[in-house]
Design a protein with these regions (language model features):
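Phosphate- and other anionic-substrate recognition elements at nucleic-acid/protein interfaces
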Residues: 1-16, 20-150
Length: 150
């Protein structure tokens, strides 16, 4: 069976906004070029919720994974950059899927703006912020894919 390419209409991505306490998850396809928030996972820096991540991988059956890379504004690394890279590497090794690391600078600010514009009350931001940040990261990735937009 030939390998799928990013232009395949069924090429699905699962994206993660990695944090030490919460991990936002989003899904999107190369065909629709649209990312959607899925959920926010709780975990710790050393022990993400691998059971729920495995369930999500099994449910969505992505062809590739996307992880946000929290760089400093000048493009340099920081401790969270290294942690996100390590998380991405663990995902790649566990699930044997291609991994794309994507610059996520300002994604949380964009996510906060999206929630405000959608009228989501501030008290509900915490539960939605990370998954909308993952959506923002994945949307930026999908926007950069080669080929025509739908």
């Amino acid at each position: 069976m030939p390998a799928k390419s990013v232009s395949d209409p069924n090429f699905l991505y699962l994206a993660f906004d990695y944090g030490e306490k919460y991990i936002g998850v989003a899904v999107g396809s190369s065909h629709s070029r649209q990312a959607e928030p899925v959920t926010t996972l709780r975990g710790s820096a050393k022990n993400p919720d691998w059971v729920r991540i495995s369930r999500l991988i099994g449910e969505w059956r992505p062809h590739a994974l996307v992880v946000g890379l929290p760089l400093n504004m000048d493009g340099s690394d920081n401790p969270m950059t290294r942690a996100a890279r390590a998380f991405g590497q663990r995902l790649k090794e566990r699930y044997n899927l291609p991994l794309h690391m994507v610059d996520e600078r300002l994604s949380t600010l964009v996510a906060r703006d999206v929630l405000n514009e959608a009228g989501v009350p501030m008290r509900r931001h915490k539960s939605r912020l990370d998954q909308v940040a993952a959506q923002t990261i994945l949307q930026a990735f999908l926007n950069e894919l080669p080929g025509e937009s739908p």
